[in-house]
Amino acid sequence: MDEKQIEMASLIGEGSTWQAGKWLNKPSHCRVDDHTLELVTDFQTDFWRETHYGFIRDSGHFLGFKTRGGFTAQVRINADFRELYDQAGIMVRLNEETWLKAGIEYNDGMPMISSVLTQGKSDWAPGCFSGDPTDFWLRVTVSDGVLRLQYSTDGITWPLLRLAPFPDADSYTVGPMCCTPERQGLRVSFSEWLLSPPLGRDLHDLS
């Protein structure tokens, strides 16, 4: 294991990892309990840039962990999505103009599996979710200028959700994310957080 892998592997321990993160827009109510990060969203929080709506919002809750180059990050999310645009999942961020957020987002009366890739302006790619939206997993890998986003309904099988170009950089910030653009009070629980060097698995390897 080289120096980079040792440094990354040292971030894997759940309890120490939450404390090592740095908040962007820390929520008023949050706590760590038995390796679980629990929080309640503040009023009208969101991440979005320009497309369709014309506004820029950078007020969502994000607990970021800095990496050295490429990485794989994985987290389990529990939340009860009920109102329009309620959302929780994972975020990868280079700066306020370059980022990805992904997770469950409540839209048109149902929870959708969703991703937003922002490079100057945001896109939005929602889709139907066949699992239990109150309990799901996300995994994101960034390596050699490519971002691979996966989700899981059981923590075992990981279908591809998105494959996209993403800037090659010396470091990224990645971690749990949640927002409630239309309200406050969404309770979210994050657990089983893992951060490691890129897994390097074949694109069609769903393990």
Residue ranges of each PLM-predicted region?
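Extracellular glycan-recognition regions
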Residues: 1-207
